Amino acid sequence: MYSVHIYTKYMTNSIDVVVAGAGPVGLLAAIELTLGGARVLVLERLASPSQAMKALSFGPLAGEALLRRGMRTAIDDAQQRSAQAMQAFTQQTGADLRVRASKFNGHFAGLSLIRRDAQVDPDRRPRHVDQPALEAMLAARAQALGIEVRREHEITGIEADDEGVEVSWMSPGGPGRIVAAYLIGCDGGRSTVRKMCDFAFPGTEPTLTFYQATADVDHPERLLPIGWNRTERGVFCYGPVPGRLFMLDFTGPPANRDAPVTREEIEEVLRRTSGQDVRVSALHAASRWADNTRLVDTYRQGRVFLAGDAAHVHSPFGGQGLSLGLLDAANLGWKLAAVIRGDMPESLLATYTAERRPVAEAVLANTRAQVAILRPDPQSGAMRDLIAKLMDFDDVNRYIGEMMTGVSMRYELVASAESHPDVGRLAGDWQLSDGTYLFDAMQDGRGVLLDGTADRRASQRVTTITHQVRCLPVAEGPSWLLRPDACIAWRSEPDCTDELAGLENALRRWFAV
């Protein structure tokens, strides 16, 4: 066992990690930590979950992270509700659902040309669950695990040193404070944690305004077809559920992002971007934001971490932001829990920034590119037409599809020449020989060995080193070691003299006791 640095300033402390923010990223981080044995407290500024319609879906890798934590049925139920809402939309507007179905594979800058038949693994596809539904299912899972979430608790102070982090707050019951070993800021793009702890947040200034709203619109059929519609005045989208509006206004960034979004403002922007004589008769929810694009230099400062929008902000094209944040939580949670348990040295935590920051850099780059070809000027339109033609080529279509879903992501765990090409990739939800699925065996937060050796020698090697890996026999062939986040940490080489070469090194690097 590695010795854990005990934070002695307040010996009455009973919390290992404070998570700031009870949105999807904060809740998943708390779930991961709790499964790993950490004691967690979640502090949330809002009195209740936001019902604003933000993301309508999340990517395949984020969906798989939820499957690994026991939410298969909840996801299926939520997707069924989404399908029913889309059906209601078609009945309301007369839109062709078959057209919408062709767009389920995602898009690049509104170009819904990503083809499932061009993808290497077409079954790894986005999950059509909106953000309020996602947050509800994560909250239910957190409650089932006994995680305490304190709402209307606004963080007012953070003091961190080598022994721990003291977090102060204001709530309806008055001020309070607690000391924990670590703090994770999952509190959004305007993160209090990031600002109070002086994380550098370089990037580019906003140039335009996005609007998203749920509203009643007279003559909604005038806003068809379904999907992204680029005009000389901007971009608009109506659907794919009743009342959902999305507009992109290139006249500049919002003068005051904090000002309430009014019915009149939504109507004016919708009329201008669409060029249609439509009226917004009622506004139920609305938000505006800009395309400021920023990324922290590091995801960790001492005992304070950032995840999700607290660490990176960008334009929302392709629905990548929510998935990016959920995978931050999935990457950090099990590692931090292992350090708190004493199973791993603190040096493991350095891999969080090393693995996740390059992924965010890539997302920031592709969202900037999408903004560039959505602008209404002729030069941007010409580039957009060229990209659309290039997507007719299978290799280009596959590249863009994998970029947008993230399935091509690979962490550099070891030098590429020293390992199998699959090492560093996230495994899919493979069906096992007994008919069960891999992720159903990972719900306890441990790693997994898929042992394809004839005499189960790989399993024997594992059990002598760690109890944090579940061994599953599979048909004779390759063996695989998966971290708790389903990252492939090792794969056997069939033509290697020692087919278990590297297994022990991988076990000690990621699971050592």
Give short role names for the model-derived ranges.
Residues 1-17, 32-36:
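Extreme N-terminal leader/targeting segments of oxidoreductases
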Residues 2-11, 335-447, 452-464, 477-478, ...:
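C-terminal helical "tail/cap" subdomain of flavin- and related membrane-associated enzymes
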Residues 13-15, 173-182:
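Core beta-strand elements of the Rossmann-like FAD/NAD(P) dinucleotide-binding domain
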Residues 21-30, 66, 138, 185, ...:
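Conserved mid-domain beta->alpha element of the FAD-binding
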Residues 34-54:
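Glycine-rich FAD pyrophosphate-binding loop
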Residues 54, 58-137, 141, 241:
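Active-site-adjacent segment of FAD-dependent monooxygenases/related oxidoreductases
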Residues 140, 182, 186-291:
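Conserved FAD-binding catalytic core of PHBH/FMO-like flavoproteins
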Residues 151-165:
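A conserved short coil-to-beta-strand element within the FAD-binding core of flavoproteins
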